[in-house]
Amino acid sequence: MNEFSLFASCPKGLEYVLADELKTLGAEVLRTNPAGVEAKVDLAGAYRICLGSRLANRVLRLLQSTRTATRDGLYQAASEVNWSEHLRPGESYWIAAFGSSGDIRHSRFGAQVVKDAINDHFRDRDLELPVIDKRSGVQTVQLNLAKTITLGLDLAGRSLHQRGYRQEGAAAPLKENLAAAILYRAGWPEICGEDGCFVDPMCGSGTLVVEAAMIAMNIAPGLLNPHFLFEKAPWHDPEVWRGVYEEAMEKAVLGKRRWRGAIFGCDLNPAAIRTAKRNLSRAGLDRWVKLETASAMDFTPDTEGCGQRLLVCNPPYGERLGQELELRSLYRALGRRLKTAYGEWKAGIFTSSVNLAKEIGLRADKQYHLYNGPLATTLYLFDVYGNRPEAETPRKPQNASLEGISEQAQMFRNRLSKNLAKWSKWAKKQQLSAYRIYDADMPEYAVAIDWYDGGIIVQEYAPPKSVDEEKARQRLLDVLEVTPAVLGIDGGQLFLKQRKKQKGMLQYEKTDSSRKERTVEEHGCRFWVNLSDYLDSGLFLDHRPTRYWIQKHSSGKRFLNLFCYTGAASVHAAAGGAATTTSVDMSQTYLSWAERNFHLNKLSGPHRFVRANVLDWLKAEHNSYDLIFLDPPTFSNSKKMEDVLDIQRDHAGLIEDCMRLLAPGGVLIFSCNYRRFKLDSGIEQRFAVENHTAASIPEDFKRNERIHQCWHIRHSA
């Protein structure tokens, strides 16, 4: 048979490695693209690629191509193929169609056009029509609809990464051809040729060690699963195929006989090692690979007599923020282990996380960008011998778990330690067990850290657009790692809150299904707080002085708390001897919370909890009050409200409605946390207004004096 064109597809990023491999298998490479490599081969070359390629996915014999993306254009192109050369009369086949192009917007429509052309080809020659059958199709025609439409015959009938030895896998499996590509890029073919040594200290189900052994012993991967669709093609030549197959078998036998190197794998998970052993057994390689259940940090391979040494591993990536935080210590430990136990080795670390790769603490000699499925990943290659660390001066770390953090993170740790000493001493004198420890003291670490008697809330301030997103993420990871260690708590007691722009809902939405409740103390009162389930804890710490003022001035007073939230101000009023308290909010959740706070403080008496729209309730209420606390949200568009509340626009009317209920000699405390808020000048003209903002901001919030504004409003004399 004459030479023909074929196309070998591969994972993105492997095109040039595949092109080099195809050349060694006897192909003439014509061109590469991000999807694979086009080459010219003879029949033996096509067989050799299907049997011996470690990197390819699908191998297609190219039949036709066109750029005319119409029904007629596709039909014409398909009609020019001599289909009786590739399909037998009456034989079953399938058309695998992918993509869309021009007028051909659906792949199945494209497949139907090709089917029509095939049927017409056989009909014109008075031959029995082949039959479309996906399950039992003897051959597979592949139609790729793109800028250039191509038709091809699938030579293998499967992706070549399916070697046959892996019938089960550990978590996050690595495809066989990607594993082989990693080994190629890491230089294993050259190292193993000198009887080198290979170690995967996190081997999982063993894909890397199996592929390493097959490369070392020159075992064609197709020998493990030597069944291909081309064997049923009309043009198949059994004699040529037998010659290619026997040649590959001879190389494998000779490779096993000559191999003098060593291959090791270990994993901490016994189940993964059991799976790896079964995979090795199916590959017929269990005699040549040593597996052990052990930690990567403890495993020491016996490499006596080996030439060059290579370590490659695929550690966990940690796609979520919390996972990445937990994995930092693993990558640091891996870096330390490389320096201490693998000092004359070459190493390759395959990961999707740039941040985690930095934690290894070694300078990469080379980086290769690859894809693990859709996930962008990088293979970092290190010459560990050339990366030996400089001698370090002895130092005693403040906390062993923080060894290896960056210099900037060290500065954050030092600042947080100083703040803790200062504010914990202050809080003890104030009878407080909930207070702010850190509030963007270092601009690089723009977070607020609040202490709730053994629990922590970290609130991230949105970084400006000028700040690189990856740098901001790295700094946040620093905060999440350093904070529990400095404050002496378990990481499970830290809760991250990220205020993001929301549509159609209040900022108080539930964020977690768990309940992490605890009680905290404030000036003799106790409160339930929930650190996990909502963006806010249930206690606004910046209003602490106002609540304490209410406690000291509420004796015998009728107290009204509007937009009461969890009723903390009402608790202080009742504790201060208020004659009555009335707490109004639209949320039954928060009203129930307020009642629990009253029960916690053993407060009983004439205390009302009213579920209502505050705007409507104010207009309908006729009772008088001596002390009113008005702390509305900046903006509210709850479904329970007919109108949208905009505090800048609506505050004058709200205040006037409150003043109608305020008894002579009474005080309305109006607070607002809208940073650009301006008090209506008409309010200052009609009533006696005192700005109490400075006095209302507690010491632990002085770093952010714009956190709220506060006024005391009375009737004019």
Swiss-Prot record:
Keywords: Cytoplasm, Methyltransferase, RNA-binding, rRNA processing, S-adenosyl-L-methionine, Transferase. InterPro entries: 23SrRNA_methyltr_KL, DNA_methylase_N6_adenine_CS, RlmKL-like_Mtase, RlmL_1st, SAM-dep_methyl-trfase, SAM-dependent_MTases_sf. It comes from Hahella chejuensis (strain KCTC 2396). It is found in: Cytoplasm. It is an enzyme of class 2 (transferase). Residues 45-142 form the THUMP domain. This is Ribosomal RNA large subunit methyltransferase K/L. GO terms for cellular component: cytoplasm. Signal peptide: none annotated. The keyword Transferase applies. The gene is rlmL. Belongs to the methyltransferase superfamily. RlmKL family. NCBIfam families: PRK11783.1. The keyword Cytoplasm applies. One of its GO terms (molecular function) is rRNA (guanine-N7-)-methyltransferase activity. It holds the Pfam family RlmL_1st. HAMAP family: 23SrRNA_methyltr_KL (MF_01858). Specifically methylates the guanine in position 2445 (m2G2445) and the guanine in position 2069 (m7G2069) of 23S rRNA. Its EC number is 2.1.1.173, 2.1.1.264. It catalyses: guanosine(2445) in 23S rRNA + S-adenosyl-L-methionine = N(2)-methylguanosine(2445) in 23S rRNA + S-adenosyl-L-homocysteine + H(+); guanosine(2069) in 23S rRNA + S-adenosyl-L-methionine = N(2)-methylguanosine(2069) in 23S rRNA + S-adenosyl-L-homocysteine + H(+).
